[in-house]
């Protein structure tokens, strides 16, 4: 069993010291508007779930990425599992997940994940991961093993994956993923291409679009999904262009949410998008042909993913 050592990863200032576009530390961040306030929970379910996760040597993106919805989701007994460790090979300046030399894959992780999902009595599970540029298939085989283990232990469950870009190894990764296909395939486009060098160093906008479309062409019966964060400095026109690009690349579902700065060393919040604008963008997305849209300040790609999959409104 692989034990993850959180002391061996860089965070915040240290993590972002080597990205190509330097970010000045924020000294006077924008004041959060009332609609972005997050209620903290003292529910015992939160601590119980954290205990269960640690006992099974599992990591959640909810914790690692400092998700604003953690208390709500944990309080309801749901979580988005982050496989393949807690150290990412990328240094995205919007993300709070740590950077470092990844640990070896844990061969027991698929079974531990399946058992935890069973204990939680989940009917819908989201599996994501760090980027693993050190692996020849980007970790796709491990994804398939986790999906298959979860399904074997939990008959009837629906599995959504939120995958990295598998840059430089798309065909190999999709060949491996074909051995354990998900019910929903999600890869987040994150932001407008103009901001990629600053926000997503190591990623490539056309490549991400191609990954989504290539998966759809190979597995046309599986819904594809992507998401954007707003408030990084993009314009309304750029948001609409990205939405159209996603539709042109056969993406079925869309999430839009507000970017929140994890620390003062990360990309600053350029603006807080109003609930009204989120509603307008959601309506436009539906007109563009997305079958399912979740648009709101606290929406994240896996926030109430089960309800998103059922077509219910999430905002």
Curated annotation (Swiss-Prot):
Keywords of the record: 4Fe-4S, Cytoplasm, Iron, Iron-sulfur, Metal-binding, S-adenosyl-L-methionine, Transferase
Record flagged with keyword Iron: yes
Main location: cytoplasm
GO cellular-component term (any): cytoplasm
Catalytic activity: [[Fe-S] cluster scaffold protein carrying a second [4Fe-4S](2+) cluster] + N(6)-octanoyl-L-lysyl-[protein] + 2 oxidized [2Fe-2S]-[ferredoxin] + 2 S-adenosyl-L-methionine + 4 H(+) = [[Fe-S] cluster scaffold protein] + N(6)-[(R)-dihydrolipoyl]-L-lysyl-[protein] + 4 Fe(3+) + 2 hydrogen sulfide + 2 5'-deoxyadenosine + 2 L-methionine + 2 reduced [2Fe-2S]-[ferredoxin]
Main enzyme class: transferase
GO molecular function list: 4 iron, 4 sulfur cluster binding; lipoate synthase activity; metal ion binding
One Pfam family named in its UniProt record: Radical_SAM
Compartments (UniProt record): Cytoplasm
Cofactor stoichiometry and binding remark: Binds 2 [4Fe-4S] clusters per subunit. One cluster is coordinated with 3 cysteines and an exchangeable S-adenosyl-L-methionine.
Record: residues binding [4Fe-4S] cluster 2: 88, 92, 95
Residues bound to [4Fe-4S] cluster 1: 62, 67, 73, 302
Annotated ranges, domain Radical SAM core: 73-291
HAMAP family associated with the record: Lipoyl_synth
Annotated protein name in UniProt: Lipoyl synthase
Phylogenetic classification of the source organism: Bacteria, Pseudomonadati, Pseudomonadota, Gammaproteobacteria, Legionellales
Gene name linked to the record: lipA
